[in-house]
């Protein structure tokens, strides 16, 4: 109906407030429970706890709000394609969707979004093996981040009890819904800030749909996991389920119970391994001692043989010494005999010897020995020496 086809008297008149209230009532009565499919954008989380966002498709955008206290199975994240359940309301002359429920839509797009995020973080080096921390050999204290109720925590505690009893600290969190990833982040930070932190952390939840596991694809959670000073083992879902936290964690376990088996050795197996290693150590020590003993015996044999050789050399040296002394004495005796003979010969030509046997020695007046008659002339004075005295004489002819 156009304005020209009706009488102005027939057009109802409203105040601004009246028409606003009427539109609000019409929208509430008509769209009191609807589903809207769209992509989340413009996400805002003020301190009030309310969540403000927009839902968009290729052509249009609608504002939406989720009041603080509304429990959802999926957390808000820009880029997610979701189906929101709620009702339309007006606010400041505009209408908006009040969200009361939300599920993920378009799993193909979710998978593409997840792969894009994984590649981004991988390119940053967040998943590098060099960043991974080794697990302790035998942790005395284990931190577990999971729901305080349900099968997962029971399975973990039961497996710990039967495998190797250890001190378990449970940090209770939601493992599904819009608050899950933030609670897990706070739990990891909380464990790292304890004065006596656990030796290792297990982050666990049971299996579920991609929507159920989506909180563990959160980028902030991945960064917090990689930055943890305490080694983290992720155990999210079943063996075929992979989430971003699995790449960021130091070790990924296929199931929560498998995480316990990775973290803790089996008690009996540990005892057996220790006994086996002790046996190997004893055997190695025996082998080393045996080899050293054999070497000592060899050295003792060498020393004994050397001692015998030294004794033989000593005896030989003594024999040579005695022989040398004997030869020296013989040589000395011969020299003594030769010397005595020489002295005897010299003595025979000695003046005193000659005189003693009846000969005399003649000297001229200068005291020189006269050995020839031609050495003196008539009237020369000479001195004649006998053994018992001297006499002066003159040469007559």
UniProtKB/Swiss-Prot annotation:
One of its GO terms (cellular component) is exodeoxyribonuclease VII complex. Keywords: Cytoplasm, Exonuclease, Hydrolase, Nuclease. This is Exodeoxyribonuclease 7 large subunit. GO terms for biological process: DNA catabolic process. It is found in: Cytoplasm. The gene is xseA. Its EC number is 3.1.11.6. Heterooligomer composed of large and small subunits. It catalyses: Exonucleolytic cleavage in either 5'- to 3'- or 3'- to 5'-direction to yield nucleoside 5'-phosphates. Belongs to the XseA family. Bidirectionally degrades single-stranded DNA into large acid-insoluble oligonucleotides, which are then degraded further into small acid-soluble oligonucleotides. InterPro entries: Exonuc_VII_L, Exonuc_VII_lsu_C, OB-fold_nuc-bd_dom.
